Amino acid sequence: MTSAPAPRELIALGCRILAFRGLAADILGHISLRRDDGALYLRCRGPHERGLLLTEPSDVHPVPLDGEPAPPDGYRVPNELPIHREILRARPDVAAVVHVHPPHVVAADLAGLPLRPIVGAYDIPAMRMALDGIPVYPRAVLVTRADLGQEVAEALADRPVAILRGHGIVATGDSVQQAVVRALSVESLAMMTLRSAAGPALPPPLPPEDIAELPDLGGGFNDTLVWNSHVAALEHAGLGL
């Protein structure tokens, strides 16, 4: 029986999946996971940085929720560490935080196209997030300070995902797998939004009777099976750990 991946392996796989699927270019993006001791595991940048697509478990290091981080020699924490710290501080229900730069999400928001529930069975989790509303943090800044991280956490509020205008997204979850899959779903919805906007009129949101027919397939399907399929795709492409 295959053992479950360790936290560092999960974060490394998540980074590889996000880069492989086009949500993270070169070195831009990171994932954190809350530790039992209150600190967090975080994808750091190393002395031989090769980008998110080739993230190794050795690129992941513990970082305190407060105070000065002290990664091993040659490693440094991302400039946007405050994103992770402030969301995890504000949201005790969140275990994992993803920050990436999905191009279709950024483009749709800049074009004034809100992510509405226009798809149904095509991607039910994306529809649910859009139905509840995906908030937007309106500043296109590098989130390098605690006060900016707090602004992002306030914009996110109790939602699973938020758009950072002209920048990217934050996606949260009760696991690395859930946060990564949510990020992928939002990018998929943004891609469909942009493509459908090329028609003569924007598609309407789903009618209530259709929404009522769409079940919650549960985390075993929405998160675990989808995650496993992306891990298998990495392995097939020779990019597995």
Q: What annotation goes with each model-predicted range?
A:
Residues M1-L241:
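Glycine-rich flexible loops
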